[in-house]
């Protein structure tokens, strides 16, 4: 079996944090083993870097990235593709509104994990909420929109003059016309917005680099949940690099993933240790349409993985 060099980058990160991590408290009250400043490099010519030592749901990664690239900030698109990653943020807005008359949902993010009875009520309320977002246009407009999330920051960055900047269109234009530029950057971190945001951006900025007909991308991620979040982030930004390279007539080069606070939650230690006992499979291949579409017009069926063999999923609690 060929060595999966890209996956070893991720498994080495787990080993490094287990061996060298500092025990820290955190916003969620769960506690972590954490290191500061770590970099992984994924050679995109050596297969698509989605983990094979556990199943990673590529459909969720695709629909979320397409949502960002459309500049969409309403969870309705995600729900139409059975993606529930962002539900809680919209649901929170609904249950804290004056219109909501249902059961008390105060601090639902923690309560449903600890109280089985409340969990049933919460899941029922959230399911009804999601169904209403899908069926009721006015309700979806009012409560499905998350405001300042990645889609808005990438495609409609609000300026002090009151207009907007399309950072994705700008960066594609730069790659095509001034490929040696050192300013090919997309930022999601706006200090003015951070205090009022539900969750300040974890992926704060990314930069592109062109060399020898290849496009590389580096992401700076301020906060990295190694077991649950990072596998998604690697696959998402690798997919983004492939798609933008395709737009610009380039081959994908490297995805460089730089982490700020890289942490394993204390309630994920058994899971990462189990993952380290597994042997990686060969990396799959990403298939995109022969001719690129406009970046905001890709459909789910345009993006495929070929030969994705993986070990079973490993369940773990989310820290909220």
From Swiss-Prot:
Instruction: Give the residues the record marks as binding dUMP.
Output: 27, 182-183, 222-225, 233, 263-265
Assigned EC number:
2.1.1.45
Q: Name one GO biological process term.
A: dTMP biosynthetic process
UniProt keyword annotation of Secreted present: no
Q: Which Gene Ontology cellular component annotation is one that this UniProt entry carries?
A: cytosol
Under Gene Ontology molecular function, one entry of this record is: thymidylate synthase activity
Name the active site residues. 202 (nucleophile)
Q: Which residues cross the membrane?
A: none
Pfam families in the cross-refs = Thymidylat_synt
Pathway recorded for this protein: Pyrimidine metabolism; dTTP biosynthesis
Q: Which domain of life is it from?
A: Bacteria
Annotated (6R)-5,10-methylene-5,6,7,8-tetrahydrofolate binding lies at 225, 319
Which InterPro entries would you find in this protein's record? Thymidate_synth/dCMP_Mease, Thymidate_synth/dCMP_Mease_dom, Thymidate_synth/dCMP_Mease_sf, Thymidylate_synthase, Thymidylate_synthase_AS
Top enzyme class of this protein? Answer: transferase
HAMAP family recorded: Thymidy_synth_bact
The family line of this record is: Belongs to the thymidylate synthase family. Bacterial-type ThyA subfamily.
Q: Any idea what this protein is called?
A: Thymidylate synthase
The encoding gene is thyA
